[in-house]
Each structure stands twice: as structure tokens, then as C-alpha cells.
């Protein structure tokens, strides 16, 4: 039986030398938190220019304005948000390239998926990994969710598939900066992950709420119907299924709990597995994890009022 880990410096963080150096480095950065800067970076990194439907730009505008208004977000936190949005745009560009090369992917049928929904910290990840151990089912390892489209497949220059290697490098850095998060929610590249990273390619998820204090984004996201964005997710799943079977999916995301109508409309023949945990325990667990993340990503110290909200 593993021993309990007690974190006693959430109110007054005691950073390691590496954590402090990382945080100090973040404060030296001059980041432009705008849609234009993120789009230009994605163009430069990918060598691609076609986003397809560009309606996402207005959503990205709202998101980045909301992030910019977070006065408590440290430089390294801003860098994390910036890099994430660039990666989502690169993935979107590669998806558009994929669609042009393999238009027949759209004939794929997402049939009778198993979809796990439940509150954060209620065991959804454990249940997902348990069910996904059945080799008859298709699921998404974390490394693949980060970069779903192999560059060689869409005729880009990189002949070697480096996606897993990149994910492991990022994981090692993650363990150095936030070592205790492994005990809270281990983001090992090979663990089976939720589809939120795919949804983020269309810039309409609750994910930013985990990364920054973004009430403007939260209100904007919740005020808009999400069916089209869930259809976008389904389209990406069709592409991934076309690339590599099998054809019966197991999926999960706590976000689905607040989007059940859109989820059912998109996947009407799904089987839903709903986890339950005492909501008080959920709140305590979530607050602990967010507070620990704030040690590095907020400045000057954790922001208890925002976390409690």
C-alpha cells in the first residue's frame, strides 16, 4: 500500500532550484498573446497555410484576450498556453492537408462508441484505461492526442515519425517541473487519454479553464451551442480511424458532463458510462491539483479565490 503524500507549502510555495529557474526564465519572455502571433507561429512551424474554415479565429481572439487579462498568470504559464494553441493550430493545418489527400476518410462510420463521462477527479481516466485494455477497442494514447497526424502520411518532409519521442521529452520536462503531478494525474505518453486535445483543434472547450483564470472565455464557451464543435471532433475521429483501426471507440472527457445534449446528438448510438464520486472529495482533489499547478504557473503565489470559484 502506497504512503500518502502531504503537500504543506501550497500557501507559501517552496520551489526547487529547477522550478525557480524555470519560473524566472518565464518572466524574461516577451510573448504576444494574440491570434495573429499564434497563427504566424503555426504557419512557420508547419510550413502549411490552409486552415479550411477559419471561423475558429473569432473564438481564438476571445480566448487570447481572456488569457491576456489574467494578471496572475506567470510568464511560464503564458508560454504554456501560447505553445498549446500553436500546437492545436499545427494539428488543424495537418488535418486539412490530410482531408485533401484522403477525402475517402469521410466514409468512415463511428459506430456505437463507449463514452465515459463524469466529474473531474472521479476516476474517469482509470476507467478509460481499464476498458481500453481490450484490444478490440480503439482509444487514444496521450502521445497521439498531442499530434494526431504523422507528417510523412501527409507528404511533409519529416520521414521519421517523431511524435512519441517528442512526447517523452515533454514528459521528462514535466516531471522535473511538477514532479507530484505524476501522483495526481500521470500524463505518461503511453497512457490512454481523453479526446479533449482533438476538440481543442476547433477552439471551443473548457480546457483553458484548467490553465488560466479566464471567466470571459468560460462565459463565451458556455453561451454557445457546441454541436458543430462535437461534429468536428467526430470528423477527426473518422480520420484517425481511417489511418488505424479497430473501429469501435472508447472515449472520455469530464467536459462531456456539461455538454450531454451535444454529445448525444453527435453520437446517438453511444453507450455511456458515468462515474460517481462524492462531490466534496472531487472539489478537494481538484483544488489540491490546481493549487499545486499554481506554484509554477501563477505569480506571485497561488490564487485561492479563483481556485475556490
Q: Where are each of the predicted segments found?
A:
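Long, basic/Gly/Ser/Thr-rich N-terminal segments
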Residues: 2-79
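Extreme N-terminal, non-catalytic leader segments
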Residues: 69-111
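Glycine-rich phosphate-binding P-loop
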Residues: 116-132
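Post-Walker A helix-loop "phosphate-sensing" segment adjacent to the P-loop in P-loop NTPases
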Residues: 134-142
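PAPS-dependent sulfation machinery
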Residues: 146-249
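ATP-dependent NMP and nucleoside kinases share a basic, alpha-helical "lid"
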Residues: 255-274
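Conserved phosphate-donor/acceptor-positioning beta-strand/loop module used by diverse small-molecule
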Residues: 269-287
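Conserved small/polar residues in nucleotide/adenosyl-binding loops
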Residues: 297-302
Amino acid at each position: 500500500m502506497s504512503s500518502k503524500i502531504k503537500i504543506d507549502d501550497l500557501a507559501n510555495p517552496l520551489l526547487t532550484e529547477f522550478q525557480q529557474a524555470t519560473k524566472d526564465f518565464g518572466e524574461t519572455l516577451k510573448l504576444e498573446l494574440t491570434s495573429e502571433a499564434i497563427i504566424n507561429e503555426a504557419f512557420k512551424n508547419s510550413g502549411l497555410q490552409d486552415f479550411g474554415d477559419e471561423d475558429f479565429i473569432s473564438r481564438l481572439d476571445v480566448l487570447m484576450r481572456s488569457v491576456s487579462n489574467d494578471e496572475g498568470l506567470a510568464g511560464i504559464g503564458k508560454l504554456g498556453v501560447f505553445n498549446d494553441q500553436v500546437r492545436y493550430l499545427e494539428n488543424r493545418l495537418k488535418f486539412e492537408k490530410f482531408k485533401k489527400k484522403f477525402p475517402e476518410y469521410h466514409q468512415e462510420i463511428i459506430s456505437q462508441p463507449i463514452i465515459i463521462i463524469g466529474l473531474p477527479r472521479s476516476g474517469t481516466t482509470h476507467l478509460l484505461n481499464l476498458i481500453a485494455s481490450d484490444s478490440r477497442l480503439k482509444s487514444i494514447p496521450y502521445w497521439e492526442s498531442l499530434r494526431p497526424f504523422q507528417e510523412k502520411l501527409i507528404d511533409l518532409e519529416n520521414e521519421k515519425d517523431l511524435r512519441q519521442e517528442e512526447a517523452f521529452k515533454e514528459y521528462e520536462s514535466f516531471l522535473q517541473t511538477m514532479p507530484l503531478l505524476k501522483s495526481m494525474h500521470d500524463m505518461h505518453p503511453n497512457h490512454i487519454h481523453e479526446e479533449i486535445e482533438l476538440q481543442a483543434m476547433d477552439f471551443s472547450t473548457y480546457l483553458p479553464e484548467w490553465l488560466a483564470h479566464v471567466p470571459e472565455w468560460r462565459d463565451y464557451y458556455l453561451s454557445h451551442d457546441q454541436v458543430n464543435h462535437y461534429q468536428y471532433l467526430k470528423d477527426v475521429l473518422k480520420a484517425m480511424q481511417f489511418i488505424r483501426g479497430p473501429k469501435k471507440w472508447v472515449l472520455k472527457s469530464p467536459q462531456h458532463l456539461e455538454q450531454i445534449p451535444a454529445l448525444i446528438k453527435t453520437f446517438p448510438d453511444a453507450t455511456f458510462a458515468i462515474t460517481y464520486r462524492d462531490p466534496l472529495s472531487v472539489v478537494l482533489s481538484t483544488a489540491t491539483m490546481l493549487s499545486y499547478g499554481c506554484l509554477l504557473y501563477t505569480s506571485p503565489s497561488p490564487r485561492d479565490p479563483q481556485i475556490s470559484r
